[in-house]
């Protein structure tokens, strides 16, 4: 699946207040995705892939230099919006025309594992060239999510509980098992994803599985009558 589909998922989840509908949206997304894309999506939603490739401040500076716009004006817009990724995506809409569709269907996996990491290893001039190319070759509707991923500021109003329940229903696995498997680091690899949705419990998982919790109740009978 592509960045376009992930951006639609972001929009659908962000605009929906119903827990049950968010769960259904996620389940449908998982069914329509490849395992590797699901792994990357889960990692992003849980905030485990929020690596900063370029800072928000540098993103604004680069936009200013690439499109010859006064930085002071961009900074004023930033104070009103409060988010570098969002203000830059809004301003970009007035300056971009897709030159080609080479990145139109780029996968989330390729984006966060291959393309964006290159930004960290380039000097500033080459960073600007690559960033401009990326901006020019993705649909405008994807710019907000793209910039949030670039700046490591991707957040969405979906709790870990909703994500856990969605995976549990999607994979038909007990929710407590999914919750345990999501603990700690979760690198978005095919191997980790296959472990996450594996229906068989391993011995060490059973050993650490918590007992069901129940509140204590008062005992109102005489012990000899018990």
What function would you assign to each model-found segment?
Residues 1-226:
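N-terminal nucleic-acid-engaging modules of covalent nucleotidyltransferase systems
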């Amino acid at each position: 699946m592509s960045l376009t589909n992930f951006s639609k998922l972001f929009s659908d989840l962000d605009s929906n207040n119903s827990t049950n509908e968010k769960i259904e949206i996620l389940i449908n997304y998982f069914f329509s995705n490849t395992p590797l894309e699901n792994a990357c999506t889960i990692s992003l939603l849980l905030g485990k892939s929020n690596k900063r490739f370029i800072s928000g401040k540098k993103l604004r500076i680069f936009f200013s230099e690439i499109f010859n716009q006064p930085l002071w004006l961009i900074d004023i817009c930033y104070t009103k919006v409060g988010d570098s990724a969002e203000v830059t995506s809004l301003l970009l809409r007035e300056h971009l025309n897709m030159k080609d569709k080479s990145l139109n269907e780029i996968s989330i996996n390729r984006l966060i594992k291959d393309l964006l990491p290159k930004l960290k290893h380039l000097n500033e001039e080459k960073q600007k060239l690559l960033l401009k190319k990326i901006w020019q070759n993705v649909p405008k509707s994807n710019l907000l999510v793209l910039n949030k991923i670039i700046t490591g500021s991707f957040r969405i109003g979906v709790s870990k509980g909703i994500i856990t329940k969605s995976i549990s229903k999607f994979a038909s696995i007990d929710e407590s098992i999914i919750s345990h498997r999501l603990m700690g680091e979760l690198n978005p690899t095919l191997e980790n994803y296959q472990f996450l949705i594996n229906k068989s419990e391993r011995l060490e998982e059973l050993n650490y599985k918590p007992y069901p919790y129940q509140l204590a109740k008062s005992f109102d009978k005489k012990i000899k009558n018990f």
